[in-house]
Structure formats: structure tokens, C-alpha cells
Amino acid sequence: DALNICASELPYTFGDYTFDESTVSGNYEVVFPASNGCDSIVTLDLTVRQEGSQQNEFSGTWDWFSTYIDDEHTDVFAELKEGLSSYGKVIKSNTKFVNYSGGVWSGLLDKIENEQMYMVQTNMPQQTSITGCVANPEDHPITIKNGWNHIGYISQYSADVNDALAGLNVTPQDGDIIKSYRDGFAVYFES
């Protein structure tokens, strides 16, 4: 069995076994006692993820947003809306959106996913912070479709385009474009 937990969730109880704050990632044998004396032993592949805080700066117009805080452990959407407060106007994905009016967010967008990129419109510059368990990119495969894709960037660190795209299961085609909101674009050319 495999289990992913955030360091902030420690101590964590699994069956009759409690993992304390000093627990690190690894394999653990956990015994499940049985009343008939035939105890079950499970080897648990435990991953303890670090906690992080993502700082976001919104310009007062439209900005791109994605997150490396794991959407499985943290309600990123609630934290983003709370951080934007009354300065937020619209949060939109490729297919859904919510807008802020009269003190209420309304619309069909109901979750922020690590695999996706979102557009956020604010009515003035705003900084937000989202705290939670840092996502493992391997747990969040990104699907690329024909046409434009709003793909999330699931890393705390900057990387060049080739390294950032290395984990995607995609073969670039001549003329494919990757575009940033502010920092330009890159075009793939077969050599």
C-alpha cells in the first residue's frame, strides 16, 4: 500500500500505528492485530511531503496563475479567493469561471487543479499566499490536447523550457508554441 501525507498532518494514525513528527518517507511494516491471533502485516510505502508557501502577485489586470501547492491536501481555490478578497474580479479556466460581485464569488468553477493554468483578473495589485503540502509533479500528469492548453507549472523553482516540459508525455511538432503571459514565447523547430 502507498500513502502520501503532508508533514503538517503528522502525527498520523494508520490502523493501530501512529507516525510521529519525526517520521520520514520510507517503507514501514504496520501490524493490524486480529482477535483470532492471525495478525495482518502490511508494508506501507509512506511519502511525507514538505509544507510550503506560494506567494502570488497579481498586477491589477489579468494574470496567469498555477500552483505547486497540492490540491489534494489543500483547498487552493478557497485560499486563493480569500487572499484576493474584494480585489478579485474573475478566476477562469479554459472552460469555467467565477466572478466576484457584491461580496460573493459565483460561477461554475469550483476547484483549482495543479495540472491547469488559470487567468485571474483583479481590480488593483494584490498579493496572496497559499500554504500547504508541496505537490509532487509525478502525481499530477498533464494531458496535452490539440490546440491551446492552459498547463499548470507544478514546481517551486524556475526552469528553462526544455527542462520544464521534460516530464510531459508529448512529442513536440514543428511549429508548436509555448507562450508566457509576460516573458515571451518559444517555438519548436525540428532540426
Write out the residue ranges for each language-model feature.
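Proline- and Ser/Thr-rich low-complexity, intrinsically disordered segments
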Residues: 1-52
